Swiss-Prot record:
Pfam families: IL8
Protein's cellular compartments: Secreted
Protein name per Swiss-Prot or TrEMBL: C-C motif chemokine 4-like
Family named by the database record: Belongs to the intercrine beta (chemokine CC) family.
Tissue specificity: Detected in B-cells.
Gene Ontology CC annotations of this record: extracellular space
Taxon lineage: Eukaryota, Metazoa, Chordata, Craniata, Vertebrata
GO molecular function: CCR chemokine receptor binding; chemokine activity
Length: 92
């Protein structure tokens, strides 16, 4: 009898964990990159080749610029030069 109760309890726990894992929405992984500070200087536009915005799960919003040399630089999305670069990159 004790064995049945133990096995049944274990099965209920496994089912609960599987249910939680399967019910998570696709793409709900934790953010892979968050910025905790912004660059203090404006990047030269010809250094920037791409950008992405950080996840809304991050503590502060940021635009991450990727440079020709493969560096990633965090920038404040409220700065006018950042908005200008994003607009320009979207057009190209």
């Amino acid at each position: 009898m004790k064995l049945c109760v133990t096995v049944l309890s274990l099965l209920v726990l496994v089912a609960a964990f599987c249910s939680l894992a399967l019910s998570a929405p696709m793409g709900s992984d934790p953010p892979t990159a968050c910025c905790f500070s912004y660059t203090a200087r404006k990047l030269p536009r010809n250094f920037v080749v791409d950008y992405y915005e950080t996840s809304s799960l991050c503590s502060q919003p940021a635009v991450v610029f990727q440079t020709k040399r493969g560096k990633q630089v965090c920038a404040d999305p409220s700065e006018s030069w950042v908005q200008e670069y994003v607009y320009d990159l979207e057009l190209n």
